[in-house]
Amino acid sequence: MLPQFTAAWLAADGAGVIALRRTPRADLEVLGGARPGPQQAEVAAALLRAASATGTPLSAYADDTLLPGHVLQTLGWEQAGQYTEWRGPLPTPETSVPAGVRILPLADAPDLTVRREAQDTYADRLGHTLVSDADIVPGAHEADDRVGHIALDGAGRGVGICRAWLDGDTLTIGSPGIYPDLRHTALRHALLRATCDAARLHGAQRLVMQAWGDTPAETQADTDLGLQAVTVTPIYRSRPA
């Protein structure tokens, strides 16, 4: 079993399988589910009950092809977040950088400690997974660090990040990660603006933004930028034991 995985359950006749994966939070993420068909709901429920018997809080994406939302609801799970894919023209939000914070291209911040601090701003957000140093080194996963940006506080610590990928005229980013104590500020939109402005200089015209665990206020703010949610997948959390 891979290091991030802790346990797995297989249904009879290969009707379904789920595994539990570690996350940066207390919950374990459920991966897999039950094959589509007349017994899907029954098999999915049985697998989830077995996993829940561990007593550990669990989270799972509602997916009609594997884990239908109505099965999660029947078991008492509650929607606690969502994955959203936003699309639209590159936005230019009017914003300001909070006092004591500076924003610079990721290419100018190669130090792994600083990058790790910035990446950890996602740690409490439902849907985000564990990352290794190999995932955050300059250029990891073909990210364009000329375009992606990082925010540093007065002590030089990473307090925000927006990683970026360019493909022709399309910029793809993850929703900016912000240190909890700064989430009430305009830093999220400041990072987004800096990244979009840099992408525009390289010919980008359109944005694809992937967001996990954003708050309702952040979701509304993205709607107000003229972006359209083309994919929304609810994320459920098991009820406390």
Task: Name each model feature, range by range.
Residues P24, R35-R102, T219, V232-A241:
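Acyl-donor-binding surface of acyltransferase catalytic domains
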Residues M1-S52, G158-P180:
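Conserved donor-binding loop and adjoining core beta-sheet/short helix segment
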Residues G37-A53, H184-L201, D224:
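Conserved acetyl-CoA-binding loop-helix of GNAT-fold acetyltransferases
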Residues E94-L171:
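Flexible, substrate/cofactor-facing loop regions flanked by secondary structure
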Residues A11-D13, R22-T23, G88, L152-G154, ...:
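Active-site beta-strand termini and strand-to-loop segments that position acidic
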Residues A15-G16, G76, A80-Q82, V159-G160, ...:
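A structural microfeature
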Residues A53-D64, A199-A211:
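Conserved GNAT acetyl-CoA-binding A-motif
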Residues R200-A241:
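Short hairpin/turn module used for nucleic-acid contact or packing/dimerization
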